[in-house]
Curated annotation (Swiss-Prot):
One of its GO terms (molecular function) is N4-(beta-N-acetylglucosaminyl)-L-asparaginase activity. Cleaves the GlcNAc-Asn bond which joins oligosaccharides to the peptide of asparagine-linked glycoproteins. This is Putative N(4)-(beta-N-acetylglucosaminyl)-L-asparaginase GA14866. InterPro entries: Ntn_hydrolases_N, Peptidase_T2. GO terms for cellular component: lysosome. Cleaved into an alpha and beta chain by autocatalysis; this activates the enzyme. The N-terminal residue of the beta subunit is responsible for the nucleophile hydrolase activity. Substrate binds at residues 268-271, 291-294. Residues 1-20 form the signal peptide. It comes from Drosophila pseudoobscura pseudoobscura. The active site is at residue 240. Disulfide bonds join 94-99, 193-209, 351-378. Heterotetramer of two alpha and two beta chains arranged as a dimer of alpha/beta heterodimers.
């Protein structure tokens, strides 16, 4: 009798569609659909058709960082509670390897020849953030950001005082300069400091070094040159590793690390350590990371836009396009990319100002190919007219 009642009740649950996510078998399958395999898909984005957890995904072709994060994520069965370790140590690997000289020490010297670091880690369960910006003399930027998250009630520390905090937490102070970064700076100064980030100053920043002073022209008569083609973003000039890790229980962390824009004005901070700009995570929805022209991208909070677009029902690939299209409406010459992932492990990417954008993914769908490289072709100027 009781057995018949249980069978009847189970059948009713199935018919009503109220079976919980935990009782639904997970589909171990992820295909980044290339632009050539699905005609209906725009050439601006790529997306998985099914979720697959746990997973790690990061910007650019930084496979070693992804592989380490993937190993850490699977230290315990299902990667449970390992997402923070995975993201922090994955990005740390890139800092140590000086990935393309755009992450970590010894790259992207500012106008004075100094390398400074920006990094962030965000917890999608608590919405807590730890970040550092303009970090001087400390190599472990994202580990310091983790200490901000775990040992303070703040969200961000900056500059020399961030470095003092790091030393108090046990981090070693050392020079971030290398022979390569010094040579990079010397070549730049020998070329009359070209290109640079100055405008509306004298002497003319397009042909000479500073020091500069503001023009006396009234503000209403200033002509702003918004073109940034001198700083086209791509291989060897893309600034940031952004990484997302999700475990089998849908716990999410997202993080970034960068040494910023090459030859930046000292004191400049880009999008990488800014929540909603460089990265954003919310366990209820998913996460997103961004890379590219940070000075422009941070004005639009593209990773927050992507997560909120997924909350509103858009698929990850569509959500990644939201911020990209919003930015390209105002800045035709910007270059950048966004990766979006929902809480089930479905992912997508969109980019602009480049031919294509590579990224790296690890998940259970292809255990024989961990840290596999995938790419997406970018939105063109004509496609970007259709702003979301």
């Amino acid at each position: 009798m009781y057995e018949a009642q249980y069978l009847w009740l189970f059948g009713l649950v199935l018919i009503s569609g109220s079976v919980t996510e935990r009782t639904t078998p997970k589909i171990n399958f992820t295909t980044v659909v290339g632009l050539k395999t699905t005609p209906a898909m725009r050439s601006s984005s790529a997306s998985s058709l099914g979720g697959s957890l746990p997973m790690v995904i990061n910007t650019w072709n930084f496979t070693d960082a992804n592989f380490l994060a993937w190993r850490i994520l699977n230290v315990t069965q299902g990667g449970l509670r390992q997402t923070r370790n995975a993201v922090v140590e994955g990005c740390t690997r890139c800092e140590q390897q000086q990935c393309d000289r755009t992450v970590g020490y010894g790259g992207s010297p500012d106008e004075l020849g100094e390398t400074t670091l920006d990094a962030m880690i965000m917890d999608g369960s608590s919405m807590d953030v730890g970040a550092v910006a303009g970090l001087r003399g400390i190599k472990d930027a994202i580990r310091v950001a983790r200490h901000v998250l775990e040992h303070t009630k703040h969200s961000m520390l900056v500059g020399d005082l961030a470095s003092q905090f790091a030393q108090a937490m046990g981090f070693r102070s050392e020079s971030l300069a290398t022979p390569e970064s010094k040579a990079m700076w010397m070549e730049w100064t020998a070329a009359n400091c070209q290109p640079n980030f100055w405008r509306n100053v004298h002497p003319d920043p397009s042909i000479s070094c500073g020091p500069y002073k503001p023009k006396a022209t009234p503000l209403t008569r200033w002509k702003e040159d918004r073109a940034r083609t001198e700083y086209s973003i791509g291989h060897l000039n893309h600034d940031t590793i952004g990484m997302i890790a999700i475990d089998a229980e849908n716990n999410i962390h997202a993080g970034t690390s960068s040494n910023g824009a090459r030859h930046k004005i000292p004191g400049r901070v880009g999008d990488s350590p800014i929540p909603g700009a460089g990265a954003y995570a919310d366990n209820e929805v998913g996460a997103a990371v961004a890379t590219g022209d940070g000075d422009i991208m941070m004005r639009f909070l593209p990773t927050l836009l992507a997560v909120e677009a997924m909350r509103a029902g858009k698929k990850p690939a569509e959500a990644a396009e939201v911020g990209i299209r919003r930015i390209s409406k105002h800045y035709k010459d910007f270059s950048g990319a966004v990766i979006a992932v929902d809480r089930l492990g479905q992912y997508g990417a969109a980019c602009y100002g480049m031919t294509e954008f590579p990224f790296v993914v690890s998940n259970p769908s292809k255990t024989d190919i961990p840290s596999r490289q995938e790419s997406v072709k970018c939105i063109t100027g004509k496609e970007a007219v259709n702003v979301v």
